[in-house]
Amino acid sequence: MSKTIAINAGSSSLKWQLYQMPEEKVLAQGIIERIGLTDSISTVKYDGKKEEHILDIPDHTEAVKRLLNDLIHFGIIDTYDEITGVGHRIVAGGEYFKESVVVDDKVVEQVEELAALAPLHNPGAAAGIRAFRKILPDITSVCVFDTSFHTTMQKHTYLYPIPQKYYTDYKVRKYGAHGTSHKYVAEEAAKMLGRPLDELKLITAHVGNGVSITANYHGQSVDTSMGFTPLAGPMMGTRSGDIDPAIIPYLIAQDPELKDAADVVNMLNKQSGLGGVSGISSDMRDIEAGLQANNPDAVLAYNIFIDRIKKFIGQYFAVLNGADALVFTAGMGENAPLMRQDVVNGLSWFGMEIDPEKNVFGYRGDISTAASKVKVLVISTDEELCIARDVERLKKTVSS
């Protein structure tokens, strides 16, 4: 039986999940954090057990070695030969990649070239790819792109209203992100509703530390909130989301700590959003604790967060000319009932109504009332499974 690893590598972390395929059975999962530091943390979960170790992991190559050694050490696999495929989540595929691809040297180079579109993600992903190809050179490696699902957007949707030379010369356009998640939950929503996906109009809300909203028409992405980079859209955990671009040169002129545009963009990516406004945390659980304590900064951050999400959902009702369902997914989308309640209550004009008894922590499924004209669903995303499936599919093309 073949085993496939789904990888989500960042600049200082490597998250993984091992599947037995084609049964789609999760055998183990884990994460290696703080790569590049002497107190890196490796966590492995398998058979109801959890192993955690602190050690020195200087780079992604050593992280991959540690991961593979752990799989052997804990008896999860007997030999590396059992692993027949590795799938890598890539945030930005630009216009190079409209679907998942088998990795070769050119693919790795293109992923690195696209780092400007996802500076927090693509460099780490490329490092992860190179590490696996070095250590397991004979297995099939596949790249699965967050942007691929959004390549169905029409030109009038993905182009920005700036001179077209910036698109033709520099490929400045909306690319979107979280596409693997949006695709998966839309397919699951169709099953839940008992209707063909190609008959549905859905708004999918991926609300985690990163937040993106997508308008899905008959199974295809027709608009999405993330843009040229994952910085665009609603307010997020540490990202600002959409702001007036004229703020950037203004801040450079006013704040001596912000020396150039890169400094401002770094601030917008890493020091803004819920964490930046509240001064407390980027974690919604901490923000909700602040609400309970009547912390004014927590209240302000929460209100901005809800307001921005509602506005994007409202936009996509207009884009789709109505919707059959609103789908919440990802960390906050699945586990923050107060957030879901306040978003939906602010959109009641569209005919949505939440059942408070179903809108509780841990519930999955239809949380709307019987009278709700638009269904409200909570669906757990499974990007890793989507990656593993694409590896299995593309392995057949390599062997044929």
From Swiss-Prot:
Cofactor names: Mg(2+); Mn(2+)
The keyword Ribosomal protein is annotated on this UniProt entry: no
A GO term, aspect molecular function: acetate kinase activity
Pathway(s) annotated for this protein in UniProt: Metabolic intermediate biosynthesis; acetyl-CoA biosynthesis; acetyl-CoA from acetate: step 1/2
Site (Transition state stabilizer): H178, R239
Localization annotation: Cytoplasm
Keywords per UniProt: ATP-binding, Cytoplasm, Kinase, Magnesium, Metal-binding, Nucleotide-binding, Transferase
Main location: cytoplasm
EC identifiers of the protein: 2.7.2.1
Cofactor note as given: Mg(2+). Can also accept Mn(2+).
A biological-process GO annotation: acetyl-CoA biosynthetic process
Residues given in the record as ATP binding sites: K15, H206, V207, G208, N209, G210, D283, M284, R285, G331, M332, G333, E334, N335
Top-level EC class: transferase
Gene Ontology cellular-component annotations: cytoplasm
Keyword Acyltransferase recorded: no
PROSITE patterns linked: ACETATE_KINASE_1, ACETATE_KINASE_2
Known role: Catalyzes the formation of acetyl phosphate from acetate and ATP. Can also catalyze the reverse reaction.
Subunit structure: Homodimer.
UniProt protein name: Acetate kinase
